[in-house]
Amino acid sequence: MPKKLLINLVKQAKLSLEQSNTIQDVESIRIQFLGKHGYINQQLKKINSLNWDNKSKIGTVINQVKSDIHQLFLERKKLITLKAIEKSLNTEKLDITLPGRLSETGTIHPITNTINRIRLFFNHLGFKEIYGPEIENSYFNFDSLNIPNNHPSRDQHDTFWFDTNKLLRTHTSGIQIRAMKHIPMPIQIISIGKVYRKDYNKEHTPMFHQIEGMMISSNINLTNLKKILYDFLYNFFGKNVILRFRASYFPFTEPSAEIDILNLNINNKKQPKKWIELLGCGMIHPTVLNNGGIDSKKFSGFAFGIGIERLTMLLYHMTDIRVFFENDLQFLDQF
C-alpha cells in the first residue's frame, strides 16, 4: 500500500471537487472517497494484511488523508452554498409593498406521525413502552446480545465509538437485557428511539429511528410473533398488501426471520414488482435469555426491530430518506 497512492487520493478528491458545481455533486464525491464502500475504507480494509509496524504507519497516513479530504469537502460545500446565496441576492427582488404573511398552522412530521401510530397499536395490545440510553456500552449493544467480536457492526467504519467501550447505540436491541433484569415476568415491552450508524445515502442516514419489541413468557412461540406483526402491518399499510415471512439469521434470535412487502411500484408502473425487506424478528436466543437472568428452559420469547423511516417511506412511496431531515417546508406541508 504505497504512501504515494494515498497522497494521490487527496489530489484526485481536490480536482473532482474543483469541478463540482452543486451540493449534490459534492455529496457524490464525498461518498466516492469517504463513503462506506469508498476509496478510503477500501484502503483501511487492507491494513489487516500488514505487520504491526507498517499497520501503525499506514493507519496514521490513511487517517490524515481522510481528514484532509473531509476538510476539502467542507470547504467546497461552504463555497457553493455562499455562491448560491450571492446569486439569490443578486437575482431575486423584494416588493416591500406586499402585505405580510399570515401565520401558518404547523403539521405533524411524518416520522412523528408514524411513531404515534406504532405506539397506539402496540399500547392497545398491552405492550408497555420503556426507554434506554442512546450512549451505550459494548456489553448491552453487542456482547449480551450474542454478537461475536468479529461481527461487521463492531467496525470503526460502521459504528460511532467514543472509546473502546462507549458508543452511540447501533440498534434499540440494547434495551432487551435491561428489561429482562428489571421487569418481572411476563415481559411485554416496546422501545422507540434514535439509533446511529456510519452511513449516508438515499437509503441510510447517520441517525434514524427504530422500534424494538419483545415478549417473554411461558409457551411463547413463532406463531404468536407472526400473528402480532402481520396484524400490525395490515393495520399500518392496509389489508391489501402482500407480505412474505422468510427465514433469516441474527445472532440474538434463533430461529430468525424477516418480513418482506411486495412493492407494487405505484409511482412507476414500468418497474417490475419486487420484494422489499421490512423488518427483522425471531425467537430470542437462549444465550440472550440467560444473559438477562431468565431461565431459557422455562421461558421463551420473541423480539423484533423495525426501521421507522423505512415504514414511512413505503407508506408514502418515497425514494430518498434524507428528505426527512432537510427541514423543507414544501415537503413537510404535504403531511
UniProtKB/Swiss-Prot annotation:
It holds the Pfam family Phe_tRNA-synt_N. Its EC number is 6.1.1.20. One of its GO terms (cellular component) is cytoplasm. PROSITE patterns: AA_TRNA_LIGASE_II. It comes from the Bacteria. Gene3D superfamilies: Bira Bifunctional Protein, Domain 2. One of its GO terms (molecular function) is magnesium ion binding. InterPro entries: aa-tRNA-synth_II, aa-tRNA-synth_II/BPL/LPL, Phe-tRNA-synth_IIc_asu, Phe-tRNA_ligase_II_N, Phe_tRNA_ligase_alpha1_bac, Phenylalanyl-tRNA_Synthase, tRNA-bd_arm. Belongs to the class-II aminoacyl-tRNA synthetase family. Phe-tRNA synthetase alpha subunit type 1 subfamily. Tetramer of two alpha and two beta subunits. This is Phenylalanine--tRNA ligase alpha subunit. It comes from Blochmanniella floridana. The gene is pheS.
